[in-house]
């Protein structure tokens, strides 16, 4: 129970939320950051067609629309980036997400050729990637592209990390975890669904089974299968409820194992890894 409380406090999860209030918190958070650094003019986010990027994208667009109206500065823009690896199986969901979000700009960069070129260069150096590591390569290529776009548009890269993902470390280090700002960090999975419902998002985008879809050998592998625990159980844990001890052990095991992912590079002054 002590570790559970430490985790809840570290991730800032509330046991109950008001969806409209949380929407306003996230939008104002994004706006205040850009106001603090007026040389920044854009928010850049990869859109996958899943719950998290759909929610984050909508919040980004709301923030930029309000900033333009409040400041009179038409340079503020939200750039949604489609980053398929070849042909994406749920491409229609991606298009539905774009239709819902209505981004200022939509860019599409297919990462397949870049990933294959990197894999070939490594192969020539004697390194053959496993399917799992190739999946990480895809995630990092996507983030590289987003930073290039942000760099050319006075922008910041927005992340989709939320509490149910952070607690398990279910993201690629310096891939989808390598962002500038994370506006939904404090929310668990179910709370994110509530925000999308309040925003009028099509149900199929937040009722679908979450998948990172990074592995070629296991396409569409559901998050809950990879983690060995359901998001419902993770959400209940993060809300301070007592859950099945076996599920709690899995969640806490992921949390401890992936601590390094939630920190900046380790220095001689860090000691968390010794505990």
From Swiss-Prot:
The EC number(s) this enzyme carries: 6.3.1.5
Reaction(s) catalysed by this chain's protein: deamido-NAD(+) + NH4(+) + ATP = AMP + diphosphate + NAD(+) + H(+)
Binding site for ATP: 46-53, 160, 189, 211
Keywords noted in UniProt: ATP-binding, Ligase, Magnesium, Metal-binding, NAD, Nucleotide-binding
Domain of life from the UniProt record: Bacteria
Primary role: Catalyzes the ATP-dependent amidation of deamido-NAD to form NAD. Uses ammonia as a nitrogen source.
Name of the molecule in the record: NH(3)-dependent NAD(+) synthetase
Source organism per UniProt: Erwinia tasmaniensis (strain DSM 17950 / CFBP 7177 / CIP 109463 / NCPPB 4357 / Et1/99)
């Amino acid at each position: 129970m002590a570790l559970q409380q430490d985790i809840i406090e570290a991730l800032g999860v509330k046991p109950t939320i008001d969806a409209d209030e949380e929407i306003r918190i996230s939008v104002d958070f994004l706006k205040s950051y850009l106001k603090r650094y007026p040389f920044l003019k854009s928010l850049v986010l990869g859109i996958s067609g899943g719950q998290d990027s759909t929610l984050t994208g909508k919040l980004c667009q709301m923030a930029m629309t309000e900033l333009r109206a409040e400041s009179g500065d038409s340079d503020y823009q939200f750039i949604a980036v489609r980053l398929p690896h070849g042909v994406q199986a749920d491409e229609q969901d991606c298009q539905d997400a774009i239709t819902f979000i209505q981004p200022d700009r939509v860019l599409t960069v297919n990462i397949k050729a870049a990933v294959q070129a990197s894999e070939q260069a490594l192969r020539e150096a004697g390194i053959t990637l496993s399917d799992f590591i190739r999946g990480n390569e895809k995630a990092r290529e996507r983030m590289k592209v987003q930073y290039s776009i942000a760099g050319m548009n006075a922008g910041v890269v927005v992340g989709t990390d939320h509490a149910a993902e952070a607690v398990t470390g279910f993201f690629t280090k310096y891939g989808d975890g390598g962002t500038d700002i994370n506006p939904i960090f404090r929310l668990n999975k179910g709370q994110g669904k509530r925000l999308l419902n309040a925003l009028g998002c099509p149900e199929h985008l937040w009722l679908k089974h979450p998948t990172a879809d990074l592995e070629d050998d296991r396409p569409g592998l559901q998050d809950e299968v990879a983690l060995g625990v359901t998001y419902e159980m993770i959400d209940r844990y993060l809300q301070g409820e007592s859950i099945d001890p076996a599920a709690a052990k899995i969640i806490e095991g992921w949390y401890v194992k992936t601590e390094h992912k939630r920190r900046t590079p380790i220095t001689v002054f860090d000691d968390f890894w010794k505990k």
